[in-house]
Amino acid sequence: MRAVEEGISMGQLHNKKLRDNARTLRKSMTKEERHLWYDFLKDLPIMVHRQKIIGNYIVDFYIAEAKLVIELDGSQHFEEEWQKKDESRDAFLKSQGLTILRYANSHINQNFQGVCQDIWNHIFHRE
């Protein structure tokens, strides 16, 4: 490993890969991510991060002030393999004290106002 010889740890390589991947994902949002971002999240009165690295995961949207993660799920997330990955990911995020809201892309397309209201309630009306 040339990187290790040059004094770069495997952890740093992993983090760089995640960082590069997050940057790529921010540049290539899905139609539903763009809709939620440009038509709702970016104008909220609190900071919303897109494609945020948390641990070894990249979450779609993260609101630190509300300890809230928002994930938009395409059809692949309904496959058994993806569901197991999502369960593991959600368990880690919950162990960090975060709340996870998951919405199917179809929900964004068919009930956008309802999704926005649900997110608003979790941010501003939490107990």
Which sequence ranges carry the predicted segments?
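Nucleic-acid endo/exonuclease domains
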Residues: 2-127
